[in-house]
Amino acid sequence: NTLGGTCLNVGCIPSKTLLDSSEHFHTALHDFEKHGIDISKPKVNLPNMMARKDEVIKQTCDGVNFLMDKNNITVYNGLGSFVDENTVSIEGDKKSVISGDNIIIATGSKPNYFPGMEPDKQRIITSTEALSLKEIPKHMIVIGGGVIGLSLIHI
């Protein structure tokens, strides 16, 4: 429901943010001692990692919204359908009809799943839920080799 689509909100940006935090943890756990830095054994604070991820998303969304305003771009949210090749009817908070020579339809995307393995958001989750886990699972199977799935296996 925010600008930036899957990548910014529930894909590339949040997965890479968590991956970055994981890499910092790995460095603290395995490399500090090599550099003569003694610290007690580091531990993951998942709520803080998730809060950082959410802040990065917010900052990036705010940047996109700023650019839209700065460039006088009007954004319409809702269900759109073409009336003709230059006109779109939008059902949202209010009904709008817009016309133009150039119209961008940005629908975003949703995770795919196999029949019989529909997400229940508990045991079978999509990447969206995986990026907002409340605790670190002991085991996780990632089905799919896309950018988000590949990032998840390294977090």
Describe the predicted segments one by one.
Residues N1, G145-G146:
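Glycine-rich Rossmann-fold phosphate-binding loop(s) that bind the pyrophosphate
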Residues N1-I136:
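Glycine-rich flavin
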Residues K138-I143:
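Beta1/beta-strand and adjacent pyrophosphate-binding region of the FAD-binding site
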Residues G149-L150:
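N-terminal Rossmann-fold NAD(P) dinucleotide-binding loop
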